[in-house]
């Protein structure tokens, strides 16, 4: 269950409000640590990765560079267990709160957001 709903109920509810069309079949997806509230990463979901995420309760994304489904942690073991999912007001961006098993970033850092932007 995600947010207290089973996957099939969640799909019925969200399919009515998900807007994959705006992003040419992709939804930008913000992944947040449910405990620390840190933003871990931003990735892209297509309909298949969205459904796999609901079914497995682990995050799946669409790799734009490799043009394939990507199970986060499938190779590294750094999976992300889904706690909750929420859509923004337009239905075109997804927020997923997770319990991560290890770092989210391929650099080994907890978050992909570690590059400070300097002000001039």
Each model region followed by its residue ranges:
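C-terminal binding/interaction regions
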Residues: 4-26, 32-40, 45-120
């Amino acid at each position: 269950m995600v947010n207290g709903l089973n996957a099939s109920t969640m799909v019925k509810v969200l399919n009515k409000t998900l807007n994959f069309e705006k992003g040419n079949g992709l939804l930008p997806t913000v992944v947040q640590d449910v405990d620390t509230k840190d933003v871990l990463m931003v990735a892209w979901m297509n309909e298949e990765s969205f459904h796999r995420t609901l079914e497995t309760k682990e995050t799946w994304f669409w790799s734009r560079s490799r043009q394939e489904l990507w199970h986060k942690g499938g190779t590294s073991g750094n999976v992300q267990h889904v706690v909750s999912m929420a859509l923004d007001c337009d239905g075109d961006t997804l927020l997923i709160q997770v319990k991560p098993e290890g770092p989210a970033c391929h650099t080994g850092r907890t978050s992909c957001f570690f590059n400070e932007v300097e002000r001039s």
